[in-house]
């Protein structure tokens, strides 16, 4: 049922419970606390549309038989005039469950709601005015984005859309880890290529990156090419293979630009890119360390500076500054999260790989140790597990482009139908290939809970049948578009006929099930936002597509009689809108033809 209907029914049941309690206890116990009214959809459709266990909750405190209580609650409910528009029938099941059947009109109301709200259907302003910073991808600028980054990008962008649908002002942020040992390895790798070396040659650095992209960076550097990230200053290659600092700057700018291209092909945008290096140049890391020392949260031992993370629940204290004077991985992270707090983001969510689990307690301990008002549990985390790529029944572990892993660009190209092994820049691929590949990759990577490992099957992504989940959902949308076009063409009809259509002919089991599924969408979005679980939207879309196919296969839509024809078209039009809305939440297109 729709949220407003659910609220009304909860209020009616609450009033009924109050009447029953009043009759049982009178005013003798003013401290008696009424149980919360919880409405659920029965797992078995034959049991009704809504179930409530409030009678079972009341039985013990009232010392009454739960079935008898349920009967009294139902009697009080149906006696209220407002219930007549919602409740068609009520029955008591088992030890005292209240099962309610909703009126056909209350189920049909979702169609009018969808028409009235259009693309806004499902959205809510319940979190209006609240700001949230969502950090995701945050790759090192040392190579192309891999499939793990792809999962973060898909999850993060979808979650941002879901949160925005609930009224949040969402700030999307990418944190570039551009300071550290890996950046040094990138520089010496590019320098080695610039000097004519390749992996396996004598003199090839042991820690060097072996992917072909390093050769591309070295070539463009020596050719004096100019590169720039979307938010960065242009950097021109100096053509000097001995200038390691110039090589480093060029390589970082080159790979940031490449990652920008990957994200553009993936349809992901950020509001801000934050550079780790700025934390050092602006003195934020030193300031944070000094503040922790002043707060008594650190101690010196064996030449290293330790943070008392055990004070905040960690299993042991952690080294902050090593004996060589460099900082461990989590120290700039603490400084970075201080900037998030100082920028006014009281709600922060980080999407990271599960290999970052160990840093959570350290970062939170550092933030708590500063005593600047940051609440415990700040920031929130969504941790995702690894992605395995399969093709032709075999795991794909490497690509020519990256050398040691499958890239996001590989997945987009392969899932769009490009020939495996081809090296084509996203801007040179046709738009249909990019869209098809992007849709498949995004939907697939969101279609499982983040904390479960995911097997990405290229062969499945290319299938054009109901085995392919994104095809199954998109085909439902395209099929409806085809029927709507045929309706307009054959009968000279227009969409203007639909909002005021008589919906009473929608009385079949399949029609009722489809309308109930449509009405669930607002709750699905609210749940996805509350639980930071965008996969719930993907699950829902598959269920909605299934209900549509069941309805479409059971009932002819374009029948001769106008009333049932228009009613069924109205139901299809509402279903099309909700499919489009849900796909948009995931960043997936809703094609009108397939």
From Swiss-Prot:
Record the organism: Burkholderia thailandensis (strain ATCC 700388 / DSM 13276 / CCUG 48851 / CIP 106301 / E264)
Superkingdom per UniProt: Bacteria
According to the UniProt record, what class of enzyme is this? ligase
PROSITE patterns, A to Z: AA_TRNA_LIGASE_I
Q: What GO molecular-function term can you cite, just one?
A: ATP binding
Q: How does it assemble?
A: Monomer.
- Gene Ontology biological-process entries: arginyl-tRNA aminoacylation
GO CC annotations, alphabetized: cytoplasm
Report what the protein is called.
Arginine--tRNA ligase
Which Pfam families does this chain map to?
Answer: Arg_tRNA_synt_N, DALR_1, tRNA-synt_1d
Q: Which InterPro entries match?
A: aa-tRNA-synth_I_CS, Arg-tRNA-ligase, Arg-tRNA-synth_N, Arg-tRNA-synth_N_sf, ArgRS_core, DALR_anticod-bd, Rossmann-like_a/b/a_fold, tRNAsynth_Ia_anticodon-bd
């Amino acid at each position: 049922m729709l949220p407003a209907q659910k609220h009304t029914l909860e209020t009616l049941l609450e009033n009924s419970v109050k009447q029953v309690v009043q009759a049982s206890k009178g005013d003798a116990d003013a401290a008696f606390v009424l149980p919360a009214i919880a409405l659920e959809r029965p797992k078995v459709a034959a049991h009704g549309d809504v179930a409530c266990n409030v009678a079972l909750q009341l039985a013990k405190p009232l010392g009454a038989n739960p079935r008898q209580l349920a009967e009294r609650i139902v009697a009080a409910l149906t006696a209220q005039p407002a219930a007549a528009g919602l409740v068609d029938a009520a029955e008591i099941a088992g030890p005292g469950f209240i099962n309610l059947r909703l009126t056909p009109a209350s189920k049909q109301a979702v169609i009018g709601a969808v028409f009235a709200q259009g693309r806004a259907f499902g959205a809510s302003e319940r979190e209006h005015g609240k700001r949230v910073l969502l950090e995701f991808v945050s790759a090192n600028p040392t190579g192309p984005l891999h499939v793990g980054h792809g999962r973060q990008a898909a999850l993060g962008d979808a979650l941002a859309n879901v949160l925005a649908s609930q009224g949040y002002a969402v700030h999307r942020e990418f944190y570039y880890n551009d300071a550290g040992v890996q950046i040094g390895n990138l520089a010496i790798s590019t320098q080695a290529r610039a000097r004519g070396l390749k992996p396996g040659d004598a003199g090839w650095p042991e820690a060097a990156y072996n992917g072909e992209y390093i050769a591309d960076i070295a070539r463009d550097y020596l050719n004096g090419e100019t590169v720039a990230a979307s938010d960065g200053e242009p950097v021109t290659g100096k053509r000097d293979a001995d200038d390691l600092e110039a090589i480093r700057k060029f390589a970082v700018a080159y790979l940031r630009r490449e990652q920008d291209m990957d994200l553009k092909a993936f349809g992901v945008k950020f509001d801000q890119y934050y550079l780790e290096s700025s934390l050092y140049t602006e003195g934020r890391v030193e300031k944070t360390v000094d503040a922790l020392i002043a707060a008594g949260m650190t101690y010196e031992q064996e030449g290293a500076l330790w943070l008392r993370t055990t004070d905040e629940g960690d299993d042991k204290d952690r080294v902050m500054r090593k004996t060589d004077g460099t900082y461990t991985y989590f120290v700039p992270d603490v400084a970075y999260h201080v900037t998030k707090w100082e920028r006014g983001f009281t709600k922060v969510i980080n999407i990271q790989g599960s290999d970052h689990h160990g840093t959570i307690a350290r970062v939170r301990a550092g933030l708590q140790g500063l005593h600047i008002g940051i609440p415990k549990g700040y920031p929130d985390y969504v941790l995702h597990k690894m992605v395995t790529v399969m093709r032709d029944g075999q795991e794909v572990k490497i690509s020519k482009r990256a050398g040691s892993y499958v890239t996001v660009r590989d997945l987009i190209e392969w899932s769009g139908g490009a020939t495996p092994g081809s090296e084509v820049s996203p801007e040179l691929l046709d738009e249909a290939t990019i869209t098809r590949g992007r849709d498949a990759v995004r939907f697939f990577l969101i279609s499982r809970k983040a904390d479960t490992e995911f097997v990405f099957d290229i062969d499945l992504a290319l299938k054009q049948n109901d085995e392919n989940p994104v095809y199954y959902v998109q085909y439902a949308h395209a099929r409806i578009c085809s029927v709507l076009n045929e309706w307009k063409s054959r009968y000279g009809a227009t969409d203007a006929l639909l909002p005021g259509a008589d919906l009473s002919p929608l009385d079949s089991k399949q029609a009722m099930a489809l309308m109930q599924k449509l009405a669930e969408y607002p709750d699905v979005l609210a749940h996805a936002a509350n639980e930071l679980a965008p996969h719930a939207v993907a699950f829902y879309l598959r269920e909605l597509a299934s209900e549509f196919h069941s309805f479409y296969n059971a009932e002819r839509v374009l029948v001769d009689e106008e009333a049932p024809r228009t009613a069924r078209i109205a139901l299809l039009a509402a279903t099309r809108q909700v499919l489009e809305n849900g796909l948009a939440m995931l960043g997936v297109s809703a094609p009108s033809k397939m």
